[in-house]
Amino acid sequence: MDIGSIRHDFTEHPPLLEQDLAADPIEQFAAWFQYAVDSGISEPNGFVLATVAADGQPSQRSVLLKLFDEEGFVFYTNYSSQKAEEIEKNAQVSMSFPWYALQRQIHVYGRAEKIPREQSLAYFLTRPQGSQIGAWASPQSKIIESRDFLMLKWQNMKAKFHEGKIPLPDFWGGYRVRPHKIEFWQGQPSRLHDRFLYEKTENGWTVSRRAP
């Protein structure tokens, strides 16, 4: 199928200038993230996480951001999943927030590290009960024989934990991505898009405009 005729011009925003940007990329991320939330787009905290296997093969998946601050970006997962196994071998990852409806993207490059278990527990206890049970029931990234197998395991776990709080699995928790580069992209007419790259140095952050 030839889809070369599918195209869309970008006219949503005025040109982005360096003086419009915050000196700190986390502050700039917060401003754009709030704009995304206020715009009403679906799951503005959704991003694409890229990891690399030991053989050099990259893989990607959609993940939900659950916290960000000056220390970085936090997400949660099964520590036996493909993404976690790849992070254990190569902690360098990238995160992309593809806000197509807003004609904006943010790309984060950094190193992933496990967060303290008590922090994972605090978040786990805020999850809906079904999601807590799901964390126990799903052997994430492993081969399973059918959906019925998964649903039966979920029902068994629900019965097991029918009394009291559901404990945090030993194999489940969070990662924090500590960024060393963050790029902000904003669409402009004639494909003359705005791109600014923040890079971390010993003295803080530098920012430079990059050609689209």
Swiss-Prot record:
Residues annotated as binding FMN: R61, S62, V63, L64, L65, K66, Y76, T77, K83, Q105, Q140, S141, W185, R195
EC numbers: 1.4.3.5
Binding site for substrate: K66, Y123, R127, S131, R191, L192, H193
Leader sequence segment: none
Record text on cofactor binding: Binds 1 FMN per subunit.
SUPFAM superfamilies: FMN-binding split barrel
Cofactor: FMN
Domain of life where this protein originates: Bacteria
GO MF annotation: an example: pyridoxamine phosphate oxidase activity
Protein keywords: Flavoprotein, FMN, Oxidoreductase, Pyridoxine biosynthesis
Keyword Flavoprotein attached: yes
Pfam (any one): PNPOx_N
Catalytic activity: pyridoxamine 5'-phosphate + O2 + H2O = pyridoxal 5'-phosphate + H2O2 + NH4(+); pyridoxine 5'-phosphate + O2 = pyridoxal 5'-phosphate + H2O2
Record pathway: Cofactor metabolism; pyridoxal 5'-phosphate salvage; pyridoxal 5'-phosphate from pyridoxamine 5'-phosphate: step 1/1; Cofactor metabolism; pyridoxal 5'-phosphate salvage; pyridoxal 5'-phosphate from pyridoxine 5'-phosphate: step 1/1
Entries under InterPro entries matching the protein: Pyridox_Oxase, Pyridox_Oxase_CS, Pyridox_Oxase_N, Pyridoxamine_oxidase_dimer_C, Split_barrel_FMN-bd
The keyword Flavoprotein belongs to this UniProt entry's keyword annotation: yes
Record-level GO BP terms: pyridoxine biosynthetic process
Protein task: Catalyzes the oxidation of either pyridoxine 5'-phosphate (PNP) or pyridoxamine 5'-phosphate (PMP) into pyridoxal 5'-phosphate (PLP).
HAMAP family assigned to the protein according to its UniProt record, in alphabetical order: PdxH
Protein family per UniProt: Belongs to the pyridoxamine 5'-phosphate oxidase family.
Subunit structure of this chain's protein: Homodimer.
Protein name: Pyridoxine/pyridoxamine 5'-phosphate oxidase
Originating gene: pdxH
